[in-house]
């Protein structure tokens, strides 16, 4: 199973926040070969500053692959990034043009790029705690077969949730 991590999972892990143990369980599953973990290269725009920027370069040491992203002027790497889907971009523009003051916030451009690259690479599930992405999970699944979940829901679904055992 090919799992893409959103940037907020990395911050939780690196900053020793309360949900760090969930990220550690995902890393253990990857170390066992049960899942493949990846981040998209757009994470470099999410995390431009030290000390976390250099942490991106060490992700492969903990079992997280860095995949390409969507080609975007000013943020494009030959041989890594790929052209986007017109249908996906049209969908994003539809949502943005329909958005009105007071509506729930939409994902920002980096979030859209993470989701878009995840879809183009045929990955299985995108894990995040970002409310803007989670609010769109049903429509993303219906229109593009992009499965967006919280790490908690994912771990329960694959049968590794041990919260009932006090962990």
In which residue ranges do the predicted regions lie?
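Short, well-structured N-terminal submotif of metal-dependent ribonuclease cores
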Residues: 1-62, 166
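Acidic, PIN/NYN-like endoribonuclease modules and their adjacent C-terminal/linker elements
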Residues: 2, 104, 115, 119-167
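Alpha-helix capping/helix-boundary segments
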Residues: 9, 43, 114, 132-133
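Short, flexible loop segments at the rims of nucleotide/cofactor-binding pockets, characterized by
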Residues: 14-17, 101-107
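Short, solvent-exposed polar/charged micro-motifs at secondary-structure junctions
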Residues: 47-52, 76-85, 157-161
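Active-site regions of enzymes building and remodeling cell-envelope glycoconjugates
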Residues: 53-72, 145-148
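Acidic catalytic patch
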Residues: 65-105
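Acidic donor-binding loop at a coil-to-helix junction in glycosyltransferase catalytic cores
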Residues: 110
């Amino acid at each position: 199973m090919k799992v893409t991590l959103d940037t907020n999972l990395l911050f939780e892990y690196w900053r020793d926040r309360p949900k760090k143990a969930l990220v550690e369980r995902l890393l253990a599953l990857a170390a066992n070969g049960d899942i493949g973990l990846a981040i998209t290269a757009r994470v470099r725009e999410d995390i431009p500053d030290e000390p976390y920027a250099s942490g991106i370069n060490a992700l492969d040491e903990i079992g997280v692959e860095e995949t390409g992203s969507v080609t975007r002027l000013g943020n494009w790497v030959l041989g890594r990034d790929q052209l986007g889907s017109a249908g996906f971009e049209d969908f994003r523009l539809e949502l943005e043009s329909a958005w009105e003051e007071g509506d729930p916030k939409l994902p920002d451009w980096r979030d859209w790029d993470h989701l878009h690259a995840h879809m183009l690479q045929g990955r299985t599930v995108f894990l995040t705690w970002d409310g803007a992405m989670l609010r769109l999970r049903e429509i993303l699944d219906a229109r593009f077969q992009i499965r967006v979940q919280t790490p908690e829901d994912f771990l329960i679904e694959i049968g590794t949730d041990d919260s009932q055992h006090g962990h």
